[in-house]
Amino acid sequence: MKTALAALIVGYGLDLLLGDPSFLYHPIRVIGNLIALLEKWLRKVFPKTPNGELAGGVFLVILVCLAGYGVPALLLFAAFKIHPVIGFLLEVLWCWQIPATKCLKDESMKVYQKLKENDLPGARYAVSMIVGRDTENLSETGVTKAAVETIAENTSDGVIAPLLFLALGGPALGFLYKSINTMDSMVGYKNEKYLYFGRCAAKLDDVVNYIPARISAWLMILASACERMNWKNAEKIYKRDRYCHASPNSAQTEAVMAGALEVQLAGDAVYFGKVVKKPTIGDDIRPVEAEDIKRANHLMYLTSFLGLVFFAGIRAFFLFL
C-alpha cells in the first residue's frame, strides 16, 4: 500500500502548513455528535443503576467503535472503486485532519499571546479552550503550567498516537483511535454523572494509549537532545515521575516535558468546582514562564517529526522488503 504511506506523509505536511481551517468541517465533530446522541438514547434504554449505566457505557463503546472504523473504511473503499486518485485524495484529507499538530500549537500560542499582553482574563479564557480544569481563578503561573501540560499530554494522544495508528492501518484505524479518544474526553470522567457510564470508554482509552504514550515519551527525550535541552534531566524525571497521575499514560510525556524544561508541572487542580489532589511532576529548578509555552511547542513539533520518520520508516521497510 504505497499510496497509504504517501498519504500519511502528505497529510502530515498539510497539517503542519494549514492545521484545521475553519472552512473544512472536521469529522471529529461528527463523532462527537454521535457520542452525544447515543449517550442520550442509551441513558433512556438502560436502568439508572450502577450496573445499568455500566452496560450502557459498554454499548456506547461498541457502537461508536463500529461506526468510527466501519464508516471511514467503507467510504475509502468506495472512493478507490470510483477512481484511485479520488481514493488517494480522500486518504490524504483524513491523514491531514486526524492529527492535531498545528492546531495544538495555534491554540496554546493564543494563551502565550494573551500572557505577553498582560491580559490574564484573556489568557484564562484561551487556556479554558484546551484544558478540562476550571480556569477562572488561575494565576499567570497556573495558566502557563496548564498550557504546557496540555501540550505535553496532547503530544501523545493528539499527535503521536494518531500518526502511529494511521501508519498501522490508515484513516480507518486512525478514526477508530480518535473515536475512543473522543469518547474518553466526553464521558470518561470520575464524577457522579459518568463514574459508571464512562468507565468502559476511559479504560479502553488507557489501553489504546499505553504503547503510544511510551513511544511519545522516548521520542520527546530524543527531541529534547536534538533541541539541546536538558535531555538527561528529561530522562531522569521521566523514569521517576511517569506514573504520578491517576491515568497510567498522562504523566509519561508530562514528565519528559517537565524534565526538559527544568520546571515543575501538575499538582492540585480544580475540576467542576472541586479541588483534585495530584502529585507534582518534575523539580522546581526554575519558575514556569510564558516562554515555556513556545519551548514546549518546539519540542512537540520536533517530537511529531521524529514520530513521522520512525513510523513511516517502519512502514516503508516492510513495504519494500
Give the residues covered by each predicted segment:
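Hydrophobic alpha-helical transmembrane segments
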Residues: M1-L176, I180, G188-L321
